[in-house]
Amino acid sequence: DACRVFSEHVDWQGGLEWDFAALHDMPIDPAFTRLVDEYLTDVMREKSKRKGWKLPETTLVLPWIVRMFPDAHYIYLVRDPRDSILGGHKTDDLADFGVSYPTTDDLLERRAISWKYQYDLVMATPKPERWMEVRFEDFILHQERELTRLEEFLGFPLGRIIVRPDSVARWQDADVVPDFDFLRPHFVDA
């Protein structure tokens, strides 16, 4: 619901363009604040020194989350859109979150538009002091290097996990290769 409150303030320019500028300075809608506070009640009550959350939908409201939590550590994990849109995500249809965009019955195109919208929103958001970008492909193929970077950023050691190199560039084996002109600048050569 917080995503829908936020999206009311996004100015769709038509096509694949949105103006996010007002979101950085306007007062945050009190309904949004209430919904986020409700949603994060358990996280905020937690007494641990380290706490947080990982939700893809957070990207849909990033400008206001950054303003509400300016001292948080933000890790932006971004993946080659061709791989990202092969699988389903809760954010596949932006209309579910009140975001206007060119409607299409093509599922991959809808996912591609969602990927672009979220990427554009992140790029338009003034970065907080504690911001780090991690490429999914780098994390998978160079895990130790990326974990070292993350540990330096966060200030504490992280556990190692098993990663699957076959999760990188899986679009190459897809029945239908997602190739949208508006995503090409974001393709990764792993």
Predicted features by range, described:
Residues 89-92, 97-98, 104-108, 116, ...:
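PAPS-dependent sulfotransferases, especially Golgi type II membrane carbohydrate sulfotransferases
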Residues 44, 65-66, 123-126:
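N-terminal cationic-hydrophobic initiation segments that often serve targeting/anchoring roles
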Residues 54-57, 65-89:
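Conserved phosphate-donor/acceptor-positioning beta-strand/loop module used by diverse small-molecule
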Residues 1-53, 59, 94-102, 186:
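PAPS-dependent sulfation machinery
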Residues 1, 65-69, 133-158:
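PAPS/PAP-binding and catalytic site of the sulfotransferase fold
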